[in-house]
Amino acid sequence: LGVLEKLNTMDLEKTPRIIILSAVGQDKITQQAITLGADYYTVKPFDMEVFTKRIREMFNSAPTIQESSAQSNRVSYPTTSSYILTSEPKSKTPVDLETEITNIIHEIGVPAHIKGYMYLREAITMVVNDMELLSAVTKELYPSIAKKYNTTASRVERAIR
């Protein structure tokens, strides 16, 4: 945040694109980083493929902070335990499935820092894509999530509960 504050005091001709990789996922800090001019904010651990995709999107189509400062922020969530906040205007891209799922989980009140959060989000995404998984939660859903996150099905179940 200190670097962002310093950048804001400098009289730069062209504002650099700023991507923040952090271990801190607190809403206040994330929002402050975006307010200070960060283009993207992601919390570790994150999916490198999704992160690379977001960076490419940012440099191919995203406006600068100054161009979009009057418009509201869009939150985009990859399928890992991280999330990326961007200052892109909402009208540029439609709300995707990941964002919708994360918003609903947040509304319910599940805190993002708990281990079960990422498992729950992954489970919902998988069920949306294949409703048959609902009839085999302990036999197929939990084991497939466990495999993806290199853990056991019982740990996935316990963390979600």
Curated annotation (Swiss-Prot):
InterPro entries assigned to the protein according to its UniProt record, in alphabetical order: CheY-like_superfamily, Sig_transdc_resp-reg_C-effctor, Sig_transdc_resp-reg_receiver, Spo0A_C, Spore_0_A, WH-like_DNA-bd_sf
Record keywords, A-Z: Activator, Calcium, Cytoplasm, DNA-binding, Phosphoprotein, Repressor, Sporulation, Transcription, Transcription regulation, Two-component regulatory system
One of the Pfam families matching this protein, by short name: Spo0A_C
Cofactor(s) needed by this chain: Ca(2+)
Note on cofactor: Binds 1 Ca(2+) ion per subunit.
UniProt GO BP: detection of stimulus; phosphorelay signal transduction system; regulation of sporulation resulting in formation of a cellular spore; sporulation resulting in formation of a cellular spore
GO CC terms, sorted: cytoplasm
Compartment(s) of residence: Cytoplasm
UniProt keyword annotation of Calcium present: yes
Residue ranges annotated for the Response regulatory domain, each copy included: 1-59
DNA-binding region: 143-161
GO molecular function per UniProt: calcium ion binding; DNA binding; DNA-binding transcription factor activity
UniProt xrefs under NCBIfam families: spore_0_A (TIGR02875)
Functional summary from the UniProt entry: May play the central regulatory role in sporulation. It may be an element of the effector pathway responsible for the activation of sporulation genes in response to nutritional stress. Spo0A may act in concert with spo0H (a sigma factor) to control the expression of some genes that are critical to the sporulation process.
Protein name: Stage 0 sporulation protein A homolog
Organism: Clostridium butyricum
